[in-house]
Amino acid sequence: MKFKIAFAIYLIVCLLYYTLPVFGPVSLRHILTLIMLVWCIFEQGFIFDKFLKWFCVFLFFSAIGSIVTGYASVFFSRLLGTYLAAFVIYMSTKVVIKKYNGGRWVLSVVLIVAVLNALTAIGQFYGNPIATFLLQLLRVDMSEEMMEFYENTEDFHGRYVGGLLGIVTSGYFLSGACVLALYNAKKKISVYNWLLFAVLFFALFLVQERSGLGAAILGAFLYIMVNTVNSKNAIFRLVFVFVIAIVVISRYGGGLVDWREMRYSTVGFEDVGRANLSMKGWHYFLDNLMGGIDGFHAAGNRDPHTVFVNVFLYGGMFGGLVALGIIFSQLRKVLQILYESFRKKNHSLMLNVYNVAFFCYILNSFFHNASLVSGDVMTFLLFGGVNVLLEMEKAESCSQIEIDDNLSNNINSINPIVE
């Protein structure tokens, strides 16, 4: 139980308080990362599976690119901060789920943070004084919150609602959390699941992340299709929730265009359009085949907004190919689990909910920057959950086959066949 509590604290720190300083450049996340790494080794040995090995190959090429472009110190700072934390989250997730049967524990911690994030986003949008205490507790700058509220118009026009994690990260996080909210061990989605889903989905809508909203809708449909006893009834309820959301959007979302970034218009496309950003990243890579994301940033460029370019900016030509191999391998595993669940219904509810939530993160990475190569914590956590739950299912299946074989041999020895 101590390890599970430590994991919960560590995950919350990684998501919300990762910049909280302790002394000098050392943050609370740095200290807890080392503690959890040592603890993981004592609990289950040093976990260094095939995924982590290939990711280390990617990091090797990423380091070379950073050294060549003169940003070695920045890379090693990212290595000891972001990447090491992602590694430890991956390993500790596997330990919690495998050794302590903590799949629901991990899911619960994520949902607690998701609810706090959702309530904060809703409070930000409405400027409700009730949200003040929560915002202060979670270290959100209240002066900026109030100033932004008074500057905004009555609709969504120009309004930034980032929750606790920021606009894009909240889009990722809430889309996966919407799927996790539908998990029920009894294989029947309850009223509480729907209420939790509705709150998270509403907050996701307020955040205005289009890819996150689409991923949440698709993920919810997929999870319901492969898991519920009465799929038609559950889908009817889900459609009802979406209809209510559409009514709200139609009534209050007339000014949804975020004009400051022009995310919903073609005006200013040359400067901030996603295709233009991706092309700038691609051209930079062609001029610097060894990569170097920090050099790209130093030149005044914004991130390319797609993992297919980011892999080459972070890892160069060779590291990018390695990262693409990892991502396509992950996508293949996700789709295979979904296919098997549709055809045979032989995977656990827990595996399916982690799998679909991870699928949402993969979809988001196609249109944004947080991904495997950036060391996104939730990407590593959800994939760690998928891997360990699949390993446990295979081990259980092999154990059952061995038991059946032994039973068959015992029966044959007791009742020899007489010709």
What do these predicted regions represent?
Residues 119-128, 207, 227-269, 282-286:
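A membrane-periplasm/extracellular boundary helix in multi-pass inner-membrane enzymes
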Residues 107-141, 154-208, 213-226, 332:
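Alpha-helical transmembrane segments of multi-pass inner-membrane proteins
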Residues 18-30, 65, 72-81, 165-170, ...:
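Helix-loop-helix junctions and helix-breaking kinks within/between transmembrane helices
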Residues 54-60, 72-95, 105-110, 114:
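Aromatic-anchored transmembrane helix interface
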Residues 1-45, 60-69, 361-363, 377-381:
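N-terminal signal-anchor transmembrane segment
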Residues 189-193, 217, 221, 225-228, ...:
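Hydrophobic transmembrane alpha-helices and their immediate junctions
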Residues 34-39, 217, 221, 354-364, ...:
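Transmembrane alpha-helices of multi-pass inner-membrane enzymes
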Residues 259, 266-303, 308-311, 315-322:
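TM-adjacent membrane-interface loops and short helices in multi-pass inner/ER membrane proteins
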